[in-house]
Curated annotation (Swiss-Prot):
GO function terms (MF aspect): ADP binding; NAD+ nucleosidase activity, cyclic ADP-ribose generating
Catalytic function, reaction form: NAD(+) + H2O = ADP-D-ribose + nicotinamide + H(+)
Phenotype for Y950H: Loss of resistance. Loss of resistance
Name assigned to this protein: Disease resistance protein RPS4
Pfam short name (any one): NB-ARC
Principal EC category: hydrolase
Comment field (misc): Only two amino-acid changes (N195D and Y950H) are linked to a change from a resistant strain (cv. Columbia or cv. Landsberg erecta) to a susceptible one (cv. RLD).
Length: 1217
């Protein structure tokens, strides 16, 4: 009997728990026998075919599969030889589809993909066994499904005894989750806490995305890792899926404990029961007593103390509930080791000081969200063929829910069995207001907030995505101080109604919509609730701004947020409009469509004698404020943020006013502003933006009191001539860019980190410049009066970026040592000698007409990664470049003739991506071009190992590229043709696992010499076909040129573009295929030139080439290696390079040359490449080159002779004969 099934040593049990499907010839006497023993020792019934009479039909075994609860499908090398094994697998698949069986696949020295896709010898045996069998299709479906279930892999490195224990553990976990007899909701998650698991694909239990959640939670509960008692908190926003997760956990884990209890809906139960009922309920579950009394619990407590228990408490909402259960929890914690307690809550503060660790339940990813939504939207019609028609709409609803499980469930349920018109209508309604069923979920948490917390929550919704410090400052006031404001933010964060990310306060979209709904409801009630108005139709009535409507009182208006981009017509504002708004805190007239707020027309007509008695206002934003000053009755006592961009304001207010809370002021582009006297008492001011205030001439001396000012922007203040002497100790960023009349810079702070002096009229830096020991960025671009950089700049030890671009009179850069300087921009200067700075990474010398050569010592700049030499028109030669250089841009170096040989040092561990650009170097000599191509070849060879380093070969961008004037494909390319399309017949096994990448070449020509472009990009569409498969074309980058900084340029000459890429999709696809099969393959390549995003018709590819790049296999003899296009040697430092294609002798060995085509060369006995024959012409065009198998073998034998491999030569001779 070919089948392989196993059972217990006892008499046949009434029902077998486990059936093992395996190939007896492979595993019966080894692995499976040990597995059976281990299962029996754990009291698990196992079926074995020894109990059936030999010769009985297979139907008996299939019946045993139906009777079992779990099947272990063990796939081994010869599994597919047995039709019995495969028929059993077909039955297993049917039972798992019905939900009556749990399958755990085990891959014994096989990859799951090999089983799933029937690859290699495993697949060959299947095809041989199933040849002509009509059941072949169903068997393939079984192979496709079962291996997709997460299973256990046993490879060559595995310790089999450990894997046996892992399987036993998985079986026990699965058995605890299987419901009683007769239930059809079989659990399909089997592997529990191990590294493996199962899933059925038909998730009837609605746990989409829960597998990973459960696994993560189980890791925190791990009984093997944590021996003592452990309490875990499960937290997350309302409706995120905590209850579903805990029920799954309880169902899976309860069988591991002698006592276990799940108390759910604690929030609801606490509202209807006394708190002392909670410990009674818990003890009742744990002690199995019907009605235990807390006063007489000594015996239950002692039982609790002696047993390992599992306690799950769901939806805890108040500290009092925890306190009521504290005594029991303490007994559990002091009791027997191994107990576990899980507490789920939407308020993380309740778990502080109680739990050992916390698991935060995150939103679902897009895939699981879509599955969950579809499950509920088509719950009665999962096979609905029209589901595809609803896909686009589904994406919209899933995006709306943002991974929130309950929202997905609610929305899907509301759309179930509804028409597409209803779906469209529902989406439009959701844009106006959220679903009431979603609102009700958040309403429970909102109702439990204090009044202050409710106001803070609704206020934060108006300022979401703002800095946390900013939000807390707005909330802080005379009635709610900074401590209370921070407390409110923390409380809301703990309750998951808001969250902080990267220092910003964020809010889930559903909660944001909920907050808006709460405010809208307030207007429909008695008007006693404070309101925030943001809909323009609620603010503007009949062309007049008027919020006094219905029963709502002006005194209850807390905020007005008017987006002027939504206002079509001009509106008027009554002079007395704000008189009764004594509680108005936030007033914003802004434009959401123009971030810079510069193109908005002033749509609000304001009377001259506007009254603005807003004592409580915290935030005042008024785009294009039309008055010369704020009204006299305006009181900024609580003002925190003042923003009046593009205003007509000349000064803020008349006289001095107390501004103890003012921290942010933005008056940018208020071109009439001439006085800052109103800020004389703003001692807490942190940011001041005066960009574009072109009339402002001076700063008041009183501003020296601003000890907290950290940011000062004076960009474009063209009338500003100087700053007063002051010491702003907190100032970190100072911007004077474009202050064209600013001549002398005084040191107003020793703590400046970023200093912008670009476009000013300064001629020298201050004498005490060395005090700026925290200065990181110094920008002096376009300082045309600047003639020298003082040597004391070298004392700025923190300086990382120095920008001196377009300082036309700067001729000398001092010899200084700035150990941390990374970026040095000297483009457009008159410097004649390049500075030697060992730490510099980015060096720009472009547009320099003085430099004729670079110092030889540049090769020692080991940190240099980017060298910009564009338009250095006097540069005639370049020395050897350093090994880590990633980008060299020598575009437009019209005098450049020679390059160093070698062009750059290449390290044996080379892995840097790099680009070398020599476009429009019209005088580049032929020797220089040959060195560039030789360097490209060596670089391609070394980078072949990069695909193993970079994400398993999934690097899609070009790993190396270069371009230079020329009209020929380099000789080391194995395949080339005239035109933009290349078709190649590749050798068998070309795609074996040593394939590292492809080298591509394109020669382009400009059809219109007068055409100017800002970017050229050459790409190649690579397509491979063989007997079995056809792959979707994959586009590989070859190389590109970009004119940075704007502008366009001509590319008049023909240019050669060379690129090396790992071509990951093609290689990956072939590696997953069967590389052992000997199939001829055809490849087609098409090269295109694009100017940005679209094809550029003014440029064409008139020659192209291809070489496949392979890594050398030291375990194979070189006769086999000659099948490769380009070989990668063991050490490239051992070879002597050349471009003539000859075999160079290095240390007693010969290195295989890279040749254009074997048939083009004739070889002598000494291995040297003889003179090439002329290329044969067809119809006036070069004939496309093909490899000759005969010449290929000749070359192989000659190389073997060189290396003394006589046996290999004899083998090839016999084979050819």
């Amino acid at each position: 009997m070919e089948t392989s099934s196993i059972s217990t040593v006892e008499d046949k049990p009434p029902q077998h728990q486990v059936f093992i499907n395996f190939r007896g010839a492979d595993l019966r006497r080894r692995f499976v026998s040990h597995l059976v023993t281990a299962l029996k020792l754990n009291n698990i019934n196992v079926f074995i075919d020894d109990y059936e009479d030999r010769g009985q039909p297979l139907d008996v075994l299939l019946k045993r599969i139906e009777e079992s609860k779990i099947v272990l499908a063990i796939f081994s090398g010869n599994y597919t030889e047995s039709v019995w094994c495969v028929r059993e697998l077909e039955k297993i698949k049917d039972c798992t589809d019905e939900g009556t069986l749990v399958a755990i696949p085990i891959f014994y020295k096989l990859e799951p993909s090999t089983v799933r896709d029937l690859k290699g010898k495993f697949g060959d045996r299947f095809r041989s066994m199933a040849k002509g069998d009509e059941r072949k299709k169903k068997w393939k479906e079984a192979f496709n499904l079962i291996p997709n279930i997460m299973g256990i892999i046993i490879d060559k490195k595995s310790v089999e005894s450990e894997k046996v224990n892992e399987i036993v553990k998985a079986v026990k976990t699965a058995l605890t989750g299987i419901p009683p007899e007769g239930s059809h909701n079989a659990v399909v998650g089997a592997l529990g806490n191990s590294n493996a698991g199962t899933s059925s694909g038909d998730k009837k239990h609605e746990t989409f995305g829960n597998e990973q959640r459960l696994k993560d939670l189980e890791e925190k509960l791990d009984r093997d890792k944590y021996k003592g008692t452990r309490i875990i908190g499960v937290v997350g926003m309302p409706g995120i899926g905590k209850t579903t997760l805990l029920k799954e956990l309880y169902k899976t884990w309860q069988g591991k404990f002698s006592r276990h209890a799940l108390i759910d809906q604690i929030r609801v139960k606490s509202k209807h029961l006394e708190l002392d009922r909670l410990p009674q309920m818990l003890l009742g579950e744990l002690s199995k007593l019907n009605n235990p009394h807390v006063d007489n619990l000594k015996d239950p407590y002692s039982q609790l103390h002696e047993r390992k228990v599992l306690v799950v408490l769901d939806d805890v909402s108040k500290r009092e509930q925890i306190d009521a259960l504290r005594e029991i929890l303490d007994w559990i914690k002091e009791g027997k080791e191994g107990s576990r307690v899980v507490i789920a809550t939407s308020d993380m503060s309740l778990t502080n000081g109680l739990v050992d660790d916390t698991y935060m339940v995150q939103n679902l990813n897009h895939r699981d969200s879509l599955q969950l939504f579809h499950y509920h939207a088509f719950i009665d019609d999962q096979a609905n063929p029209q589901k595809k028609d609803f896909m686009k709409l589904s994406e919209g609803f899933v995006h709306y829910a943002r991974g929130h499980p309950l929202a997905l469930k609610v929305l899907g349920g509301e759309l179930n069995k509804k028409s597409m018109d209803h779906w469209n209508s529902k989406m439009k309604k959701l844009a106006q207001s959220p679903s009431p069923n979603i609102v009700s979920v958040f309403q429970v948490s909102y109702d439990e907030l204090t009044t202050a917390q409710k106001d803070a929550f609704l206020d934060i919704a108006c300022f979401r995505s703002q800095d946390k410090d900013y939000v807390e400052s707005l909330l802080a006031s005379s009635d709610l101080g900074s401590a209370e404001a921070m407390s409110a933010v923390k409380s809301l964060t703990d309750k998951f109604l808001i969250n902080t990310c990267d220092g910003r306060v964020e809010m889930h979209d559903l909660l944001y919509k909920f907050s808006r709904e709460v405010d809208l409801k307030a207007s429909n009630q008695d008007g006693s609730r404070q309101r925030r108005l943001w809909l323009h139709q609620h603010i503007i009535k009949g062309g007049i701004i008027n919020v006094l409507q219905n029963k709502m009182k002006a005194a209850n208006v807390r905020g007005i947020f008017l987006d002027l981009s939504e206002v079509e017509d001009e509106t008027s504002l009554d002079r007395d409009h704000f008189i009764n708004m004594g509680n108005l805190r936030y007033l914003k007239f802004y434009n959401s469509h123009c971030p810079q707020e510069c193109k908005t027309n002033n749509k609000i007509n304001i009377p001259d004698k506007l009254k603005l008695p807003l004592k409580e206002v915290r935030c005042l934003h008024w785009l294009k404020f039309p008055l010369e000053t704020l009204p006299n009755d305006f009181n900024p006592i609580n003002l925190v943020d003042l923003k009046l961009p593009y205003s007509e304001t000349e000064q803020l207010w008349e006289g001095d006013k107390d501004t103890p809370c003012l921290r942010w002021v933005d008056l940018n582009h208020s071109s009439k502003l001439c006085s800052l006297s109103g800020l004389s008492k703003a001692e807490k001011l942190q940011r001041l933006n005066l960009e574009g205030c072109t009339t402002l001439k001076a700063f008041p001396h009183d501003m020296k009191k601003m000890k907290m000012l950290a940011f000062l922007n004076l960009k474009g203040c063209t009338s500003l001539e100087s700053l007063p002497e002051m010491n702003l100790i907190s100032l970190k960023t100072l911007t004077l860019s474009g202050c064209s009349t600013f001549k002398e810079f005084p040191l107003i702070s020793d703590n400046i980190e970023t200093l912008y002096l670009d476009g000013t009229a300064i001629s020298q830096l201050p004498m005490n410049m060395e005090k700026l020991q925290r200065l990181v960025v110094l920008n002096m671009k376009d300082c045309k009066m600047l003639e020298e950089i003082p040597g004391r700049v070298g004392e700025l030890k923190a300086l990382q970026e120095l920008i001196l671009s377009d300082c036309l009179n700067l001729k000398i850069f001092p010899e200084i040592d700035i150990s941390f300087l990374n970026i040095l921009l000297l483009d457009g200067t008159a410097i004649e000698v390049m500075p030697q700075l060992p730490s510099v990474q980015y060096l720009c010398l472009s547009r320099n007409a003085k430099i004729s050569c670079l110092p030889v010592g540049i090769s020692q700049l080991s940190q240099l990664k980017w060298l910009d030499l564009k338009y250095c028109t006097s540069l005639t030669s370049v020395p050897e470049f350093p090994p880590n250089l990633q980008c060299l841009d020598a575009h437009g170096c019209s005098s450049l003739k020679t390059v160093s040989k070698p062009l750059a040092r290449i390290m044996p561990t080379e892995q840097n991506h790099s680009t070398f650009i020599f476009t429009n170097c019209e005088n580049l000599e032929q020797a220089a071009k040959e060195e560039i191509t030789s360097y490209a070849q060596r670089k391609c060879q070394l980078l072949s190992y990069a695909r193993k380093r970079y994400n398993g070969g999934l690097v899609s961008e070009s790993l190396f590229s270069t371009c230079f004037p020329g009209c020929e494909v380099p000789s080391w390319f194995c395949h080339e043709t005239v035109g933009s399309e290349l078709e190649v017949k590749l050798l068998p096994h070309w795609h074996d696992k040593k394939l590292a990448g492809i080298a591509l070449c394109a020669v382009i020509s400009c059809l219109d010499p007068q055409d100017q472009v800002s970017r050229l990009s050459v790409t190649c569409t690579f397509k491979v076909k063989d007997e079995d498969k056809s792959w979707v074309p994959y586009t590989c980058p070859v190389g590109s040129w970009t004119r940075h900084g704007g502008g366009k340029d001509k590319i008049e000459l023909d240019h050669v573009f060379i690129g090396y890429t790992s071509c990951p999709h093609t290689i990956k696809c072939h590696e997953e295929g069967n590389s052992d099969e000997c199939n001829p393959t055809e490849a087609s390549l098409k090269f295109t030139v694009t100017g940005g995003t679209s094809e550029n018709g003014k440029y064409k590819v008139f020659k192209c080439g291809l070489s496949l790049v392979y890594a050398k296999d030291k375990d194979k003899n070189s006769a086999l290696e000659t099948k490769y296009d380009m070989l990668i040697g063991k050490s490239f430092q051992e070879t002597s390079e050349g471009v003539d294609g000859r075999v160079k002798k290095t240390k007693g060995k010969y290195v295989m040359p890279v040749e254009k085509n074997f048939q083009e060369t004739t070889e002598g006995v000494d291995g040297r490449v003889k003179k090439k024959k002329k290329t044969r012409m067809d119809n006036g065009r070069p004939k496309k080159k093909q490899r000759s198998g005969r010449d290929d073998n000749q070359t192989r034998m000659q190389v073997e002779l060189q290396e003394g491999n006589i046996n290999s030569v004899i083998m090839h001779t016999v084979k050819n004969f």
